[in-house]
């Protein structure tokens, strides 16, 4: 436990170089005949596809092997956070890819999925005489602090961002409360105990781990329960419900209740990113991934109950029904809408202003909609050919011609 410290963005070139000298950041040799994927345990088409396998089928059509990051024992967990594999595609929380693109290496933003009304909540002990944010004046609010300099402190970023937003929405500032930091090693990413055996599917990670009740994903709950702090930020309604189920905690503020959508940016929207090397040298690999995501996303949108049963294996909703309620209004087809790009920009600006990244960049230049557009076009052309094949002597191809249809 420590008092709040002011951050300065680290020199990532130096940190990465030192990590390599120490024998860290081991990764498989580059082979463009295989693509690795990695994702976070959140709402995404990729997490649904773990059970469908449709993206793997798309890659088989072009003779490329599609593998989960940890399906190869040569890879540790760091590529999920710092993209140190040229041939990896990541679908996960927003803050790590922002950090990578700003300070480590150039990447391409291929698409996002946003879960609206998930800005986070403020939690206190259920029997404390605290019912409003104003009651926290002079009280202690916890803040996680990763000591791992190789990757970004995404837990701490979302907590700090959420705390500041809640204070502001209640006419308060950081001066009204005491922010207490909780440093932790955060050094498991190449730990031998976390490295084996290899996993073909990300959901295998949870076969021996009860993630819905694992306090590693609610890092400040113990400190709050023991009275070391008076309040903690919880990333979303999802995690707060798990805390409330214990009967020990309650929520006194929820950013989801406000009409302002710019408050709903707790490490979201989830972002799809690839390296610029993949995008420029092998664009078909990025397009193929997005074809899979579009197909799976459309299926999930049409079969929300089935998608909920799959996602419940990996996400932090209480059960399948709770998962269904969480995804009922979510569009699982990735997009790069203007509104979602603004949400990305909000996250980036917070990281820059608070010393989590050193370099600024233009989110609209980071986004590359041509890959999503090409994937959608290829799927549409294929569907058109399927539907017209039985009705026309020669399959029409309207999308590639300049002629008018109708």
PLM regions with names:
Residues 4-192, 236, 394-406:
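Short, glycine-/small- and polar/acidic-enriched structural segments
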